[in-house]
Amino acid sequence: MTLRSAEEGREYTVRSVDTGDEEMDSFLFSLGCYAGEPITVVSHLKGSCVVSIKDGRYTIDRALADTVAVG
């Protein structure tokens, strides 16, 4: 399952991140979005997804949300 299809308000564990872009993978890693870390989907908005990672909230677009596998 990816972040795009994840249920709002539920905490998941990041299983993998594969954007196909090393720079974007590094950016997500710097936010704390990497395998084994908890992530919560706060809400799904039109064209984007709001997530909580560690102590921050971030809005990511649908394409990026599709690259983050959670379980």
Give the ranges of each region predicted by the language model:
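A residue-level detector for short acidic-glycine micro-motifs
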Residues: 5, 16, 41-43
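Short alpha-helix capping/helix-loop boundary micro-motifs
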Residues: 23-27
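Contiguous, function-dense segments enriched for cysteine-driven chemistry
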Residues: 10-16
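Absolute protein N-terminus
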Residues: 1-2, 71
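C-terminal structural segments of small proteins and small subunits
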Residues: 42-71
